[in-house]
Amino acid sequence: MHDINFNILKDRAMDVDPDIRFMALEDLRKFLQDESAASTRTTLNQSLENFFPILLNMLNDQNPDVQTQAIKSFEPMVKYLSNETFSKLVKKLFALVQQNSSSTGNVTGMKSFTVSVPNIALRSLFAQSNSRDKSEFVSDKLSNSNYRFDPHLARYIMDYLIPQIVGNPVTIDSIELLIDLVTEIGYVLTQDELLNLSLYLTKVALTETGLIGKKSMVALERVVALVRTEVVIDKLLAQINQSIEPTKLFVIFQLYSVCLKRGIKPNSIDTIYNTITSNLNIEATEEEDDDDLDFDNLVKENSLKDEALTTLIDLVSQHFLPVESKNTVIALIKSYVNYNPLAQDEDFIDDEEDDISFSDDEQEDDGDGENDGSWKLRAKATILTRALLKSFPDTLELLSKEVLPVFSFADSNDQVVSEVIKSSIAIVNSTSPRDSTNVSELFPIIAARMKLAKETQVPLFLKLVESLNRFDNTSLVLEVFKIIKDRKLITSGSFDYLQFYSSTLKFHDNLPPLVIERMSSDFIKNLDDKSFNMITDSIKCLSLLFHQDSLEKLDAIVDLLIYKVENSKQYPSDLVRQSIIALGEAYGRADKQKILNVFKHSIEYEGTSKTTIDVLTQIYSTDIPSEYSYLILKKLSTSIMSSTEATSVASLLLMNKIFERLPSGDYDDTAGNLVQLLAVTNKANYECIFHILIKLVGTVLQETHRAPLLQTIVKLVNEGKIEVADNSFFQFITTACNQIPDLYNFFEDGLNLNSELSAKILAICASQNKLENKIMERREEFQNYYNSNINDSRLAFDILFLGYVGTHIEVKELDVQTLIGLLSNSQLTNDDNISAASTALGLIAQKHIDSAVPIILNAYESSEKTIIRGSLVDSLSIAADACNEDQKRVIWDKVFNFPVEFDHEVITELKKSGELLGKIPVVDELTINTDNLKTTYLILVITKSLLNNLQATKVNNTLLDSLIKSSIEWLNIVNIDIRQIVVGNLLTGLHSKPDTILPILDSIILPKIFDQLQAEDSFKKIITMGPYKYVLDEGLEIRKLCYEFIYSVISLENAVIKKYNINLEKIASKIIEVGLIDTQTDITVLACINLTNYIELHKDSAVELITRDGGNAFTTMINNLKKQLSKKLSAKASTQDSESHQERIKSIIKLSKKFASVVEAAESIELAAAIRVWNEYNNDLKTNFTIYYNSTDGV
């Protein structure tokens, strides 16, 4: 938009024609909302200030549209005004507000209860910003006028307005303005100022009535929300407690609730609790006869009790209720859940007696005949039940036995019934299916009530029945359906009933015919509903319905589903896909040919192809005609080449299933596409592809496809994409050998002969085709190297080749004793040859397991060299796959109990031993208490293996819990290797077995991790190099692992962090205190990375952290970062040192840039000193490290 001429704007704004005045303001608003206006910001400030008098005058415009437009004109201009100009505008508007309040009061003699026009305009200036990102309105979040006030300006405004608001008579204008001020810029108020403001608002609430009193309570809620200390809450409550009078109790309870909901536990809980309970005594009321009741007094008493119960709910919900008061609260609940002092008899709430007609104003109680408000007390008592159960789960039994049976299910008030059902559901959901006695008493109550309940209440009772589906409630379900039938309720087309059906079907495998009949009829109607959502949700339920035994209307339902698929253009794609899934569920019981015909067509369309393939994979069996399979295969031959990975994989799975049942044949197109796919597909799909290729071996190895396939295989093998354990691949190689006699020669020429994989391939080829000459060549080579140079690099391949050949035929040159002798030869130093020999020994041992294992174990026990024992353990790991339980126990006993002195030299051996034992664990010996470091380390390695591989069962989880808790204590052992594996296991467990780690994370694990963050002298070694001495910090790797663990903790989802009460502020504090002063550059970088991650994921927590204790953590962080930046690079620094130095600076700058947003959000007077230091630090950072600062991304 072009610039605006303010001289013309003024003339138009003062025109006699209201339409012109309106358009002038509209043009101004559009101009201010245009981003290009920012380019004229310097001059715009003055122009807008000059326009103020006219705009202020227009607030009194006689035309309401112009007046409204004038009000709207203030908010967009805020971001273009200087602090000085904005302050002037606030003063002018506030003067108009005061003038309006004064004139209104003088004329009427009463306080106005409407907000003045100037006040609306003034408040619009603050509706900008700090709360906008939390607003429920999208327009707020996207607003171009979103603007954050400068803290100094916010402070000035508060200092100007708050004294005048507090120092003058209270009005609706002043209270409404105060609410907005506190909400938007209240962050600048100190705790003392918040206390004073709270005391003022408390006084207003206690002295004012009507709207002003209510609004003062709203303002107090906003103020208390900013309170961060117990001191303020306690002082505020002290004033409230001093004001307790019988006439003020109604407001007192509301004030209590405001303080309690802040979540900071006060010292005066007993006083609050006693005040509440002393006003909830109903004995006196019960003793009076109905004729003696003062109705007006009763209404007042009930209203006060309503507030008392509300406050008690808040107290209990915040977990502030003293434990010893639980039973008293339960007694109160029992007293009030059926409280009705005007009841004539026990059946006062029967619908038949509700014969009094009320006006609309009298209907609020919806059931209390005299409108005494007692229904609110019954509802609140019921809500209190849920709050108590949540805070004290151990009250479940009492609530189930004493409260649940007396709930007012038949209450004449709908709100009470709703709350009763919610609380009943809470009790039922907390009850174990093993303890169903108490909840089963609900069955007859529900059945009886559903016969008489209003039709609108029936869905509420169905929710309660749903919660009982976890128990054996088939009799109740049947009774409910009988009632529905007898009452002739319309249940089709209702999401409430559909949800009930879904839950019932989910928990009951064999429902009575009456139930299934009713459900089926409704499903048939729902499938023709006008709402696509109703149809889709109904179809999802059909998958459960089709598993029921009694289902007479199956064919009718299937026909409707078929219609949906055949006429797919009439319906949303998700609805059609759900129909296909449901047809798959019905396939086993319906007309199979009809369903197969539908799938034959739906597989052709892109929107339904993937779903159809998935369903066909589930239902495919031998009874599907071969002709149909051929048709589907033709489609799959194309879809396996889909650019969509999911479709390609699904097609492969179905194709594999079909080929398992089809006879051999000519599948040339399929074979060609599979060969192409093999070259480009994901590694995870190899197994399925080779399974299919085995079935197509006759076709795929014909001249057309042979060369591309074998070349692809060679490429995949040489690139390491095939694994030694890929059984389907080697099955294909074995099958292919029967088709191609010279396959050995092809692979020998193409494969990299330095890998175990190549050795295994060639061994299979040689064995399958009985190529004795090839085997003899390798035997002779082995003998030659064995006798001349056992460290020749070519020996490894020969050993592996003969080892794999030895799994098929006897190779006399390579028996168990020979391989053990080779491994024991002190001259064998080539690592590849050692590895090859241990692998071959394991392979040979598998074939002769009974004789080989004792020989290997004997060699293991007699060897004095750790490298030899480690190699023999590798062999046993391979052989163990063929061992029986007795043999595994022998291996365990020998290896686990082998005596060896624990030091760093045997770590590799112990790792191998632990990995072996992890495959064959003896649980009893894992849970022993030991001081032996070797045993400790072995258990830790075994634990790591179990964390990665153990299936989650109750027994296994108990074992892991025990192992983890034991290992945490081992962090006290001063040994680098042990500490490293303990922290590594905790990290592994956090990812693979979080249910084991998370419950003890904050209370047990993190304190131990924090202990490891400090560099320890016991892990430091002094190394002398010429005239210089260097300190080697061997504990560095432990600290690195700890920071990796902390990073994973910080990255947990917020729901997990909240569930397990993980204290993020404490974690961040430890990093600031310890990590940012670590002498090792790597740790400084990791500390910065962790803090940056913390800010990105948990900004609110970071704000909370730096505002605590007067900003101590904030100040510590600044000082520690300064210390890091003050470190200079040595003149003799190496290239690596220079790179580390640069990385440290960049990480600090990135953290500082990220931290700026936290500082901005936390700005307050209390942090003023720390923020000044921060600004100085930030300026120095930009000045001293300009190049790094400009090149480092802080977003």
From Swiss-Prot:
HEAT repeats lie at residues 1-37, 45-83, 168-206, 397-434, 436-474, 703-742, 846-885, 999-1037. The keyword Repeat applies. One of its GO terms (biological process) is SCF complex assembly. Key assembly factor of SCF (SKP1-CUL1-F-box protein) E3 ubiquitin ligase complexes that promotes the exchange of the substrate-recognition F-box subunit in SCF complexes, thereby playing a key role in the cellular repertoire of SCF complexes. Acts as a F-box protein exchange factor. One of its GO terms (cellular component) is SCF ubiquitin ligase complex. It holds the Pfam family TIP120. Belongs to the CAND family. Transmembrane segments: none annotated. This is Cullin-associated NEDD8-dissociated protein 1. Disruption phenotype: No visible phenotype. Cells lacking both RUB1 and CAND1 show defects in morphological, growth and protein degradation, consistent with a reduction in SCF ubiquitin ligase activity. Keywords: Repeat, Ubl conjugation pathway.
